């Protein structure tokens, strides 16, 4: 192992792929452990959420012995979800990050439809709306989700 991830400057998130979806299975996303290094607001916010989710996943693995992992979703049709937390290879938490109060991302709707038991969130950095869609997707400020994590 070499490069910035060997120095613990960045970490990688692998893609989530399941038999019933046409997911991209090779590309990994990279995030800075120091999310303040990211210059643009939207990507910096996504990086901040990645750090919080990665910390929570590691806590659940190390302290509680859970078989959980942090992934993301992107398919060949261009649908994407920023984060998919899986337990025993099954999605348990879907998280999409937005800077403001945007409409529901189609990738999130797509995954929620296929994995109805998973909790689905679209969180925003600056948005104020807090509601649940008819599909069962929670739209809320980021703090609402992040404060539930360790």
Predicted ranges, named:
Residues 91-101:
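Active-site ExK catalytic segment of metal-dependent nucleases
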Residues 95-97, 118-124:
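Short, hydrophobic beta-strand segments that form beta-sheet elements in well-ordered domains
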Residues 69, 119, 136-138:
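Conserved beta-strand segments of alpha/beta enzyme cores
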Residues 1-91:
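Accessory nucleic acid-recognition modules appended to NTPase machines
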Residues 59-62, 110-118:
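Arginine/glycine-rich "motif VI" loop of SF2 helicases in the C-terminal RecA-like domain
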Residues 101-109:
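Active-site-adjacent loop/helix micro-motif of nuclease/hydrolase catalytic cores
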Residues 127-150:
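Domain-level recognition of nuclease-like catalytic cores that cleave nucleotide substrates
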């Amino acid at each position: 192992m070499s490069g910035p991830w060997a120095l613990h400057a960045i970490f990688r998130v692998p893609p989530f792929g399941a038999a019933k979806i046409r997911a991209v299975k090779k590309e990994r996303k990279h995030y800075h452990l120091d999310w303040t290094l990211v210059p643009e607001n939207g990507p910096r916010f996504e990086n901040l959420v990645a750090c919080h989710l990665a910390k929570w996943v590691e806590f659940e693995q190390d302290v509680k012995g859970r078989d959980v992992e942090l992934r993301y979703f992107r398919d060949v049709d261009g649908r994407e979800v920023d984060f998919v937390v899986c337990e025993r290879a099954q999605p348990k938490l879907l998280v999409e990050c937005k800077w403001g109060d945007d409409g529901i991302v189609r990738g999130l709707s797509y995954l929620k439809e296929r994995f109805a038991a998973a909790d689905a969130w679209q969180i925003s950095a600056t948005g104020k709306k807090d509601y649940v869609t008819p599909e069962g997707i929670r739209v809320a400020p980021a703090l609402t989700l992040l404060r539930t994590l360790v």
